[in-house]
Amino acid sequence: MGQGESTPLSLTLDHWKDVKTRAHNLSVEIRKGKWQTFCSSEWPTFEVGWPPEGTFNPSIISAVKRIVFQETGGHPDQVPYIIVWQDLSNSPPPWVPPLAKIAVASGQDNGRKSAGGRPSAPSRLPIYPETDSLFLLSEPPPYPTSPPPPPAPHAARPAPGLMAEGLGSEGPAAGTRSRRPRSPTGDTGPDSTVALPLRAVGPPAEPNGLVPLQYWPFSSADLYNWKSNHPSFSENPTGLTGLLESLMFSHQPTWDDCQQLLQVLFTTEERERILLEARKNVLGVNGAPTQLENLINEAFPLNRPQWDHNTAEGRERLLVYRRTLVAGLKGAARRPTNLAKVREVLQGPTEPPSVFLERLMEAYRRYTPFDPSSEGQKAAVAMSFIGQSAPDIKKKLQRLEGLQDHSLQDLIKEAEKVYHKRETEEEKQEREKKETEERERRRDRRQEKNLTKILAAVVSEKGFRGRQAGNLSNRAMRAPREGRPPLDKDQCAYCKERGHWARECPRKKNARETNVLTLGDQGSRGSDPLPEPRVTLTVEGIPTEFLVDTGAEHSVLTKPMGKMGSKRTVVAGATGSKVYPWTTKRLLKIGQKQVTHSFLVIPECPAPLLGRDLLTKLKAQIQFSTEGPQVTWEDRPAMCLVLNLEEEYRLHEKPVPPSIDPSWLQLFPMVWAEKAGMGLANQVPPVVVELKSDASPVAVRQYPMSKEAREGIRPHIQRFLDLGILVPCQSPWNTPLLPVKKPGTNDYRPVQDLREVNKRVQDIHPTVPNPYNLLSSLPPSHTWYSVLDLKDAFFCLKLHPNSQPLFAFEWRDPEKGNTGQLTWTRLPQGFKNSPTLFDEALHRDLASFRALNPQVVMLQYVDDLLVAAPTYRDCKEGTRRLLQELSKLGYRVSAKKAQLCREEVTYLGYLLKGGKRWLTPARKATVMKIPTPTTPRQVREFLGTAGFCRLWIPGFASLAAPLYPLTREKVPFTWTEAHQEAFGRIKEALLSAPALALPDLTKPFALYVDEKEGVARGVLTQTLGPWRRPVAYLSKKLDPVASGWPTCLKAIAAVALLLKDADKLTLGQNVLVIAPHNLESIVRQPPDRWMTNARMTHYQSLLLNERVSFAPPAILNPATLLPVESDDTPIHICSEILAEETGTRPDLRDQPLPGVPAWYTDGSSFIMDGRRQAGAAIVDNKRTVWASNLPEGTSAQKAELIALTQALRLAEGKSINIYTDSRYAFATAHVHGAIYKQRGLLTSAGKDIKNKEEILALLEAIHLPKRVAIIHCPGHQRGTDPVATGNRKADEAAKQAAQSTRILTETTKNQEHFEPTRGKIKPRELTPDQGREFIQRLHQLTHLGPDKLLQLVGRTSFHIPNLQSVVREITSKCQVCAVTNAVTTYREPGRRQRGDRPGVYWEVDFTEVKPGRYGNRYLLVFIDTFSGWVEAFPTKTETALTVCKKILEEILPRFGIPKVLGSDNGPAFVAQVSQGLATQLGIDWKLHCAYRPQSSGQVERMNRTIKETLTKLALETGGKDWVTLLPLALLRARNTPGQFGLTPYEILHGGPPPVLASGEVVGSNGDFFPVLFTHLKALEVVRTQIWDQIKEAYRPGTVAIPHPFQVGDRVLVRRHRSGSLEPRWKGPYLVLLTTPTAVKVDGIAAWVHASHLKPAPPGAPDESWELEKTDHPLKLRVRRRRNESTA
């Protein structure tokens, strides 16, 4: 037969499966159609000699590859196909013909000649095909080309094909990363088995030059192996850190290789942390880490640098970069200091000590900032190693002598000795086996010894009885009687015949034997076996003989006799344990009876066994007689009931149980309230009621009462009087009595309104159990119950006589002669603490009952008791003991409400039956009778009543969701069909409420969770055999933030929400969470764009708990099957859903698009002349594209959004790069915009977010450009690159746009001023002593600082020599100022809004001054912001009425109506009274920023000044009466020069301070100008200087200087918690050490910040020595005491 010619193309198509496998191994994908098209049509057009039928010639394939890989004009879509062709050429498969292989080999050898012109050795095929890098499809970086190798002697010119393979730097393949076949010889290149990025390609070009390096990038296989064979950096950073450290110093990667390693091996967050830590470790010129940005960018650039690895400088840069990157890796691997993590590292049972030490040191490196290998930490590591080692090693190491002198190596040696001396597992098993055998041998020997003794006793007894006739008590043998002939051996002693003995003589009558069972009796069986009790039963129609074995728990068959079940049981025997199966139900016939039973199948059993299980079921009886044991069955006659058909319903009626068995009433007559009367707890002391510290008696008049109501409660009051529970009294306390009519009767019961008393009584923590989870502690196995209700429980506790007057009430009964007040002698009802007090008292009294009766469980809820037991007998016994205990303690039980020893009881509104809880019919009827609501309050009442039953209603939150909006008061109430439908569905669900199992705390729980329409729904279950029983149905609505998340994240919130509710029932037991999402992976690697760190930490603390586990995702579970409106959720992958719902536009980029114009946007907002101006602009590098001013008050964030939105609109249909320096605008466009849209643009509080309209406009405009990239750039940079220049231009254009529409008018100051015509005042000279005395008295009067005191003295008519030095000396020595004044804080002064004349703008604030005087506890302070004039008024309360009164009585008459009032958001200022007064007077009341006292800085500073002045005056006068000292403090405040050297008095009144108005301070008379001239002088100053200076804006301050404290200085330290009239500073202390920011002082252990220190005044010593007596008469104690009398 003929055969057609095969071509390379036909061969590949015939073996296409192998070709496709080869492509898959190369990590590329190819198609059969394109393969044929490229080979036959495309590649022949390249004109490189490619035939249409294909070829395996390497040179032709390389030529095609060069064209495909060209940077310009290349063919990226053909890259995978030519790569596979080249791989088939380099590694021919078996189906390639031999001629083709020879052609391939010859093509590979072409041009490869040796230096002498001889051909090189033939190429050897590689074992594994080399895989090309995954990065072949991306554009390669511009790596510097390697230098050519040095010329070798007689070297032949390389072939052109070899040049094209990459050794040359020209041609279309220059700069590509293609992998060519490597030469097998070692002469032409490095070893191909080592993937070094930089490889030496030959000797250096110069004698002392560098070895040239050639770049080879990492292969994808290397990266994949490193990624897959090492744990993630977050789990265990040691592996990747060690890998990269070895790669850095062995493979010499370039900058791009380092970025590739970071990109592949680390996550984004890990990579950013590593780069940040690395930049922190860049070393400066001094060898220490530097903070200079230029040095950091130079040594560790974030963008690709132009480093040439073939130069010395380039290699040095790469070396520094690698070292810094390794330091960053180690820094990022370090976790926050957590010594608890170190203590958790314990040695495993089989872990070698050296491995454990390595794990321990790694924990030190990760969780502490210490280096465990340093000398200073070796002791700590050694102690941890000893304490956390295995018990045997720890015991050995702790016994070492001189433990502190042993090194870690010594400890390791000792630990290794103990470790290697341990038994192996085989040795341990062998030893245990030998010990077991030895114990068995000893037991066998002991049993044999005992048996030998028993047999010896039996034998000796037989011998003794046989010798009684002639040998007793070791006497000699008796001689035969005379006259009786001797007997022969075979002669009978009875008949004298031969042939038998006497006991066998037939003539002898047998004597009657005594029925005594002894071993020697004739009637014993001896060694004969006892008769075995056996019975024959018919099993599945086959008669089977069973051996009755009462010691066997289960009945046994030796053969299955039918189908086997799945149940297995472990049977432990003498030879070990083995698992045996069970049969299914088998039918047994026993006489006329038929029963079904499961048998245990044991083939090794000698006979079928009838065990206790089947004997019990058959009610068998075993009788033992002389004939043997007999087994009989109970056989009762059948009974039938004949009745009429119409009477059959009586069989199904539920019998009405009697209230209580009369026998209980007779057994315990003193415990029933109906027989014994009122109870009294005899072991509880009288209750004392504690009042609040500020409580005062309250008397509330009695409400009017109808005659019917009074007559209705009179019998109850009289009964309590007769019993002594009520007694007459006279008390300042009085509360009203309310008669409440009992439903369905004409009887009334008295109820006392104790609300006013409850307000004045101290609160105690309520310890009453929560009825929601009280039943969780009731085991489901306890199905017999008794319920007791204590009668008049609170009246069982006595009330202390001192507390009785608190509960007095008014009562008038003229017929009985009672007129006045009555009060309770027992604990009253209506008192808020009565339930807690009674619950605790009863709990203490019944503590002994709980301890002595563990067989029952008793639950207590105030006065309701529940006793539960597994059996009726235990329940009855426990109830009897409880009644005895209650009778002895003095409590009384209601016989009408008692439920004793029942399987079904009602407790706390639940119906308990069979280990389950049900809703009572009365509870259901209550909800069903609720009419349709008509008001929001009625809706809330319905939801509250139905919410009690929500555990029984699946998906209650979903059903009630339409009703929740109607519960709001201010929302219009409109009842629609949807509301009526929800109302009806809740009632229908209540009627079909299922039974819920009681939680069994010995079993784990399973929580099924699902989320639909923002509602979390779940089912809490527990297993019962193969089924899961529901314990509770849970449902809850998610908060507004979580409701806007993707479905997968909403499931996380739902699980966390329901898990907290389930914990109330599970009480900390293990919970298995089952949901239709992969929750565990999301929780462990949460998306950082959707939720905050605080919320994610909260979820992880709840869900990543050792008691919470996650099951695989289940699309269908009981929670997903709960009723909903629609369910069309598809199966999905959570990670993909989260990725899809993150961005606002799929192709939006944060990196610049190449070849696209760039725009720069910016928004500006600033305050000018008290108004906030704003503008926005868009510029490019040449012109302003758009600029506009924005409305007054626009914030900077809003301006940035407007600028970015406008840029997107202007770029409609274009490709554009938009730069912005706003993080807010950038994050909104890339991340937060989609999140806001998902949430409905709501905050976590359910309110609209800020800039809502601008964000919506941005989200719409972001889709207008054809292609867009929004890039964030740093703002206000000084560089010359285009980005920094464009950003500065945009900022300038925005500022200009903000001011573009403002009309600036130039105002000139009034140059006219008063010229004095009488000259200046001539100052009076004072002597130095007079000047010092004057300054001293002036400072004692004002306690001003040096600068203010200088200004004040400078305005007097006195001249004092050396004024500055005298003032500073006196102020520095003042002890009162030193311990009171605060340190000047170096802050930049800000701008504040002020009035333009006195009395226009006031600031007001309350401040508390302790201790209060004359009832005044507060100080109301007013300050005029223009002049600084202060008004302060002591007040008793901090109310709005006080503020309004002072404004109307003090401010209004003296200063006129203010235009503006500023205050904080205190209740007194935001009240309707204050705001209403401001509205009526036309005052603009400005409320300052909340929690920002700086916004009320002027009045806050004045509060501090007044308090400091009061403190100084109180210290000097020795009193605490600050109300009396307040005028002096106001005098000081009003006469203190301000910023411009003027006092508030001068600004307001135009005159000098009153303290300087007289010249008699010194005591001499001088020639002074009259007072009128002084006033005129002041008027001139006011008109010319004062007001204009005050209107000037603040000037920025100077930069703060380092602290001046040195070692040896004496300083004062700030008190952080000083009182109102206590000094602020303590000390002095001696400075020991200093740093640029902190100081170490003697006497304080911690370092003190320099801002909390001030120099101590010279004078008093800082310490003194005292002598103290001791107990010893010849010893004295010398104690150093620090002087802090002023502190």
Swiss-Prot record:
BP term (GO), one: virion assembly
Q: Which residue intervals define the domain Reverse transcriptase in the entry?
A: 721-912
Q: Name one GO molecular function term.
A: RNA-DNA hybrid ribonuclease activity
Annotated coiled-coil segments of the chain: 408-453
Q: Which residues bind Mg(2+) 3?
A: 1405, 1464
- Residue positions annotated to bind Mg(2+) 1 are 789, 863-864
Pfam annotation, one family:
Gag_p30
Q: Where is the Peptidase A2 domain?
A: 544-614
**Annotated Integrase catalytic domain residues:** 1394-1552
What are the protein's UniProt keywords?
A: Aspartyl protease, Capsid protein, Coiled coil, DNA integration, DNA recombination, DNA-binding, DNA-directed DNA polymerase, Endonuclease, Host cell membrane, Host cytoplasm, Host endosome, Host membrane, Host-virus interaction, Hydrolase, Lipoprotein, Magnesium, Membrane, Metal-binding, Multifunctional enzyme, Myristate, Nuclease, Nucleotidyltransferase, Phosphoprotein, Protease, RNA suppression of termination, RNA-binding, RNA-directed DNA polymerase, Transferase, Viral genome integration, Viral matrix protein, Viral nucleoprotein, Virion, Virus entry into host cell, Zinc, Zinc-finger
Zinc finger residue ranges, HHCC-type: 1339-1377
Residues reported to bind Mg(2+) 2: 1162, 1200, 1221, 1291
Which parts of the sequence are marked as the site Cleavage? Answer: 128-129, 196-197, 455-456, 517-518, 1310-1311
Q: Which SUPFAM superfamilies match?
A: Acid proteases (SSF50630), DNA/RNA polymerases (SSF56672), Retroviral matrix proteins (SSF47836), Retrovirus capsid protein, N-terminal core domain (SSF47943), Retrovirus zinc finger-like domains (SSF57756), Ribonuclease H-like (SSF53098)
Q: Which residues form the RNase H type-1 domain?
A: 1153-1299
Names of the cofactor(s)? Mg(2+)
Motif PTAP/PSAP motif: chain residues: 108-111
The reaction(s) annotated as catalysed by this protein in its Swiss-Prot or TrEMBL entry are:
DNA(n) + a 2'-deoxyribonucleoside 5'-triphosphate = DNA(n+1) + diphosphate; Endonucleolytic cleavage to 5'-phosphomonoester
Residues covalently joined to lipid (N-myristoyl glycine): 2
Gene3D superfamilies per UniProt: 1.10.340.70, 2.30.30.850, 3.10.20.370, 3.30.70.270, Acid Proteases (2.40.70.10), Gamma-retroviral matrix domain (1.10.150.180), HIV Type 1 Reverse Transcriptase, subunit A, domain 1 (3.10.10.10), Human Immunodeficiency Virus Type 1 Capsid Protein (1.10.375.10)
Q: Please report the name of this protein according to its UniProt entry.
A: Gag-Pol polyprotein
| Organism encoding this protein | Koala retrovirus (KoRV)
Gene name, per UniProt, is pro-pol
